[in-house]
């Protein structure tokens, strides 16, 4: 039977000094035999998804103590990708994921904590904490801050729901008046919480439900709704229960690596494909799998993408549907329920809260359960009042969305498409693969061919789009923006948003070794691997080269002969130390911290995790 890790610092005469320090934090004699639970918070006033978390760590801590544990809270950093977007701040976003994972490891191992509750929300925080959980492999429960309410505006063209992406696109749309743009800006993000569509943050919080590491509703109940408080209260009691099961009953089924197994990663990816989640989730799931020593790869994602249909379309894929609508339709448990009914789910996987994922679905899927409390839970609605306070409203929908033919969540027979919402493409321009969010691609451009317009930075691409250098039918190529080449693998939200604002959203394609925001839609292909800085073919593309994209057949190819590519590669490598770098120096200050990340960063095909030599 495993010994409590915390006893390393709380038991024995030689630990008198450590116990003295523990006492200075408030511990008493009777506390030294109790499990020490780390409450890993991520409160910051910089990020709307985290601005309301300040008191929630202590809410969880009090519940842990009621259940018989000792709670010790600390915070990680948290970067807001939307605020960091469009300037060099975005270089720090993906590397911050590794810092978050490391900081959790440092704190938890440095103080010998027995278990942890992870309070995350936004883009890199949930993945960073997930990586730490699988790295440490101690009992863990995830509870996020919850989604933001969608904005609501009345413009000169009428009333509509809006989100952050709408505000960004409108600002670049010359046909919109300054007054309408101001209305969009002031109303797109009305409350605390992670941005209201199926962007990266919400996608990742939904996936923790499929992995079995969070409670039902974690991905969908609004940050402002009173019902979300129950998740934090239950998390405090649940973590003490599973901690005792592991340390006192030798039940290792509750450990993250046994919960988030290969089959669970298949479930999470199947959910992502079915709900048209952010392409960034691919990057983060691959990284988390590596931390958990799970052999889950791009090949597995490609296999799943060919069999899982698209059952749910949410903003940015459909402008009128947001997370509040997904919740009304039964949330993640109902999407998983439809996958299970279609034979596309591993229902026997473990969870921290139920005997199996299928048992959880039976209880929480509104299509299966007769529970009034469950149905009431999924009636939680937006309050419609701007607020930065958690649990500040208790509005309810009049009815649930149980329509599986034409509703927000659909059955396999009535899927938006039998082809899933994400796809992996392979070809000579991406030998190790690249990712496209097919849920956001118009059917008319699932097959697309056009001449390349090559840019060696996001800034140059934005300038080219805004000054009319990109024309209908072009394939915009943005390279040297990968994990090493950026460094930091910037999101390309501005280029895709500006293509939409110029009316080119359905008339152009974009390929990059960088990545995309969860708010991206259109024929936007990212994570091109190997990246240009690694010697990938994308570094050999020249303006005017024809590129063929074939999503139905999962192909992406540069229409250039192998012989010509070999000549270009030879010429590139002849540049010596200047090979596989932008032709012209970029106005980009790369700090020593970013250089350290670039030195060890792996390919996007491996999750862009750091790879250290033995």
Curated annotation (Swiss-Prot):
It holds the Pfam family ILV_EDD_C. GO terms for biological process: isoleucine biosynthetic process; L-valine biosynthetic process. Its cofactor is [2Fe-2S] cluster; Mg(2+). Mg(2+) binds at residues 81, 123-124, 491. The modification N6-carboxylysine is found at residue 124. GO terms for cellular component: cytosol. Its EC number is 4.2.1.9. Pathway: Amino-acid biosynthesis; L-isoleucine biosynthesis; L-isoleucine from 2-oxobutanoate: step 3/4; Amino-acid biosynthesis; L-valine biosynthesis; L-valine from pyruvate: step 3/4. The keyword Iron-sulfur applies. The active site is at 517 (proton acceptor). SUPFAM superfamilies: IlvD/EDD N-terminal domain-like, LeuD/IlvD-like. One of its GO terms (molecular function) is magnesium ion binding. Keywords: 2Fe-2S, Amino-acid biosynthesis, Branched-chain amino acid biosynthesis, Iron, Iron-sulfur, Lyase, Magnesium, Metal-binding. Belongs to the IlvD/Edd family. Functions in the biosynthesis of branched-chain amino acids. Catalyzes the dehydration of (2R,3R)-2,3-dihydroxy-3-methylpentanoate (2,3-dihydroxy-3-methylvalerate) into 2-oxo-3-methylpentanoate (2-oxo-3-methylvalerate) and of (2R)-2,3-dihydroxy-3-methylbutanoate (2,3-dihydroxyisovalerate) into 2-oxo-3-methylbutanoate (2-oxoisovalerate), the penultimate precursor to L-isoleucine and L-valine, respectively. Homodimer. This is Dihydroxy-acid dehydratase.
